[in-house]
């Protein structure tokens, strides 16, 4: 682009003999003027004062007019022949070393007073520099610029920054990059009174042409000085694409939370436009199998669903093709070839197998599966069709698992299980059905599938506690456990003890507890002898402070009561009802209400009546405290209930503030009273005696503390022996007896606690 501009400049300077002769006369006149102005050019003020890059030079009468007329015809501003071409040759890298050196020398400044008669060009010259030129004319430009370099034998580069001029040493070939590295804030001045400046009024940082254009100034009152402006836009690093800058005027929605568009990472295929293949009914029966394979291969193309407007026609062609394949499998019976198995499995892998990153909350907090909403797959229209097509393919009566097992192998199963971590519940539901069908078809893969699922559960329990598909895997296992043959293998019992029971300790139990409870009940139905191990495992992981999780455990215990055998119930009744008694006294009314609702179950009620001699003494104190509070409420009337102090005392004494809980506890005690009144009276008497003993121990403890306080008041420090002495001997004896009584009371309490346990 610069070559054409240089060619026009050369033509202008060499166009007429009159212009060349006049220029020689101008050079001689300027040499005479330079000798007179050398004293003034040595002043630093004149060298650094020209910040606007203006140029003042004398022009010849004939030569300038002729060049001006030619410049107007070509759409450019008049220039001064060879000297102008040497200055403008700095706009781009010269084609020859001579042109680059001459252009850089013409841009430098001389302290000794040597001047050059360069005249700056205007913005029109910059526009002309973008046009295409011939390479041969750039060589002429180099020769013309070298002649101008001879006129300046000792150039010195001076860069002014922050009103301070720094002079460099004499360089044989000063370059533009050297000037750029100095980052000048003021133009480079020359003593001759001419200046070369770049046109940066457009302010474009994306300017691809690093042009330093010369322009004529209209202000003649400025001091005659020559300078070079190196614009910031000419820096090489600023030519790189810059990031989008925020507009301060625009309003930013800082409250809006970012949205994740997909829970997995698909890799779209290279864009290849799809063409609609003919329908199956449009071809002959012999061509349907090749057409089937061609349609399956066509579905291997992946689309980017992050851009809804991208290739809408291609997405629709793929969806309709999958629908045609599904309809063809359902409505036709034919023998599947080996090639069909390979292409179908390959298409399933390409469309569905992909890495699934861990879920991350876009706000920045830890992802909570209970509160954060899952992100659905944007490509679900195609994924759903692929799942349905593969499911129809596997369920088809023409499917031969002997041929398919070389394609649906262990690696296929592992990748399929990884997809269960998808956040999209629709995909997990399709995966559940697909894996279950594969488990039923491929007998050789059953043990591997169970073992792989066990590994996922173990990693979930003891390492990550994050996996989205636990509920779906447990649902598959529920149907698998239901089909176990009796007696159960040791492998299945180990799975119950080491996998299913420890699953209760995970914090996100609520996501899969119904499926887990179903698996536990299925095991107990298969083998009732496992009841003791299951109940003791639940009591081991029983929550201490999480009331919501405690209600889940109580629901599971209720399900176990439905299938428990009477003989197995006897083995676990003591530890189980000790925990249930604690739940009855729980301040959380839903926990107490859930336990007391067991008495509405007829089977549970029969078990309690048959084993009342063991059960009633354990739960009687908890039930009696609730009923005594109900009697207190009835005796005092409604006024006492409205009293806030009575409500606080009620919550402390009875363990529950809900009156409905008191009524349910009274109903449970009434059942025991009616079925076995003798046992009820014995338990009542035992409870009252224990209450009296507790009161006596409380009074005795208070007396002992009072004696101890009196003993401390009568102590005095013996400074000689550093021992404590008692002033009154009677107090010494009373203190000794009080300490002995405290020791005996503590031993009695420990004995009572051990007997209850």
Curated annotation (Swiss-Prot):
GO molecular function: DNA binding; protein phosphatase activator activity; protein phosphatase regulator activity
Alphabetical list of Pfam families matching this protein: B56 (PF01603)
Entry annotated with the keyword Phosphoprotein: yes
Domain of life according to the entry: Eukaryota
Keyword Acetylation appears in the UniProt entry: no
Low complexity bias: start-end ranges: 12-21, 35-66, 86-119, 128-147, 197-216
Bias kind Polar residues: ranges: 217-228
GO BP annotations, alphabetical order: cellular bud neck septin ring organization; DNA repair; establishment of protein localization to chromosome; meiotic sister chromatid cohesion; meiotic sister chromatid cohesion, centromeric; mitotic spindle orientation checkpoint signaling; positive regulation of autophagosome assembly; protein localization
Amino acid composition bias (Basic residues), ranges on this chain: 1-11
Chief localisation class: cytoplasm
Modified residues (Phosphothreonine): 242, 257
UniProt-annotated stretches for the region Disordered: 1-172, 188-250, 734-757
Ranges of compositional bias, category Acidic residues: 746-757
Further details from the record: Present with 300 molecules/cell in log phase SD medium.
PANTHER family: SERINE/THREONINE PROTEIN PHOSPHATASE 2A PP2A REGULATORY SUBUNIT B, SERINE_THREONINE-PROTEIN PHOSPHATASE 2A 56 KDA REGULATORY SUBUNIT GAMMA ISOFORM
Assembly and interaction partners: PP2A consists of a common heterodimeric core enzyme, composed of a 36 kDa catalytic subunit (subunit C) and a 65 kDa constant regulatory subunit (PR65 or subunit A), that associates with a variety of regulatory subunits. Proteins that associate with the core dimer include three families of regulatory subunits B (the R2/B/PR55/B55, R3/B''/PR72/PR130/PR59 and R5/B'/B56 families), the 48 kDa variable regulatory subunit, viral proteins, and cell signaling molecules.
The name this protein goes by in its record: Serine/threonine-protein phosphatase 2A 56 kDa regulatory subunit delta isoform
Lineage: Eukaryota, Fungi, Dikarya, Ascomycota, Saccharomycotina
């Amino acid at each position: 682009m610069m070559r054409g501009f240089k060619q026009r400049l050369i033509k202008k300077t060499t166009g007429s003999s009159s212009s060349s002769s006049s220029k020689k006369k101008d050079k001689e006149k300027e040499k005479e003027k330079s000798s007179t102005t050398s004293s003034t050019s040595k002043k630093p003020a004149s060298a650094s004062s020209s910040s606007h890059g203006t140029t003042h030079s004398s022009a010849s009468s004939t030569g300038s007019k002729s060049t001006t007329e030619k410049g107007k015809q070509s759409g450019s501003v008049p220039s001064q022949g060879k000297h102008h071409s040497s200055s403008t040759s700095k706009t781009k890298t010269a084609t020859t070393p001579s042109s680059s050196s001459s252009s850089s020398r013409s841009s430098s400044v001389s302290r000794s007073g040597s001047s050059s008669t360069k005249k700056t060009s205007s913005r029109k010259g910059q526009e002309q520099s973008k046009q295409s030129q011939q390479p041969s004319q750039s060589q002429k430009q180099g020769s013309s610029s070298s002649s101008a370099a001879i006129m300046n034998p000792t150039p010195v580069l001076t860069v002014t920054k922050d009103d301070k001029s720094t002079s460099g040493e004499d360089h044989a070939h000063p370059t533009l990059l050297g000037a750029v590295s100095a980052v000048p804030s003021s133009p480079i001045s020359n003593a001759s009174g001419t200046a070369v400046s770049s046109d940066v009024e457009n302010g474009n940082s994306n300017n691809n042409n690093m042009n330093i254009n010369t322009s004529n100034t209209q202000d003649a009152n400025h001091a005659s000085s020559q300078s070079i402006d190196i614009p910031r836009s000419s820096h090489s690093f600023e030519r790189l694409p810059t990031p989008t800058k925020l507009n301060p005027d625009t309003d930013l929605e800082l409250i809006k939370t970012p949205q994740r568009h997909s829970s997995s990472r698909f890799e779209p295929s290279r864009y290849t436009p799809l063409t609609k293949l003919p329908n199956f009914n449009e071809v002959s029966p012999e061509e349907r199998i090749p057409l089937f394979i061609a349609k399956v291969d066509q579905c291997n193309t992946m689309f980017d669903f992050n851009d809804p407007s991208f290739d809408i026609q291609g997405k629709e062609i793929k969806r309709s093709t999958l629908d045609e394949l599904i309809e063809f499998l359902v409505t036709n019976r034919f023998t599947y070839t080996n090639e069909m198995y390979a292409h179908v499995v390959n298409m399933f892998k390409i469309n569905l197998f992909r890495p699934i990153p861990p879920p991350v909350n876009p706000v920045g907090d830890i992802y909570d599966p209970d509160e954060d909403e899952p992100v659905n797959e944007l490509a679900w229209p195609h994924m759903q069709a692929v799942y349905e097509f593969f499911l129809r393919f596997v369920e088809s009566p023409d499917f031969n698992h002997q041929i398919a097992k070389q394609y649906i192998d262990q690696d296929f199963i592992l990748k399929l299980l990884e997809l269960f971590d998808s956040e999209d519940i629709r995909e997990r539901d399709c995966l559940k059905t697909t894996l279950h069908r594969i488990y039923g078809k491929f007998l050789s893969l059953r043990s591997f599938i169970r073992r792989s699922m066990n590994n996922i559960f173990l990693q979930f329990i003891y390492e990550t506690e994050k996996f989205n598909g636990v509920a779906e895997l447990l649902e598959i296992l529920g149907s698998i456990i239901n089909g176990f043959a009796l007696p159960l293998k040791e492998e299945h019992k180990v799975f119950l003890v080491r996998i299913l029971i420890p699953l209760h300790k995970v914090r996100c139990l609520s996501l899969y507890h119904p499926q887990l409870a179903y698996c536990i009940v299925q095991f107990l139905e298969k083998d009732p002898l496992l009841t003791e191990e299951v109940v003791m495992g639940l009591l081991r992981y029983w929550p201490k402070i999480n009331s919501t999780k405690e209600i889940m455990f109580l629901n599971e215990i209720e399900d176990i009561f439905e299938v428990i055998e009477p003989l197995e119930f006897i083995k676990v009744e003591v530890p189980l009802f000790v925990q249930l008694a604690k739940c009855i006294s729980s301040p959380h009314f839903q926990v107490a209400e859930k336990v007391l609702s067991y008495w509405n179950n007829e089977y549970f009620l029969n078990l309690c009546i048959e084993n009342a001699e063991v059960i009633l003494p354990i739960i009687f104190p908890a039930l009696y405290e609730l009923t005594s509070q109900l009697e207190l409420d009835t005796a005092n009337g409604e006024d006492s209930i409205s009293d806030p102090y009575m409500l606080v005392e009620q919550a402390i004494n009875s363990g529950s503030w809900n009156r409905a809980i008191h009524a349910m506890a009274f109903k449970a005690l009434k059942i025991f009273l009616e079925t076995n009144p003798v046992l009820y009276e014995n338990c009542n008497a035992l409870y009252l005696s224990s209450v009296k003993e507790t009161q006596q121990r409380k009074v005795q403890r208070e007396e002992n503390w009072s004696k101890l306080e009196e003993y401390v008041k009568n102590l005095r420090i013996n400074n000689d022996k550093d021992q404590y002495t008692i002033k009154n001997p009677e107090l010494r004896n009373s203190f000794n007896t009080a300490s002995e009584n405290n020791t005996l009371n503590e031993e009695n309490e420990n004995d009572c606690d051990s007997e209850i346990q």
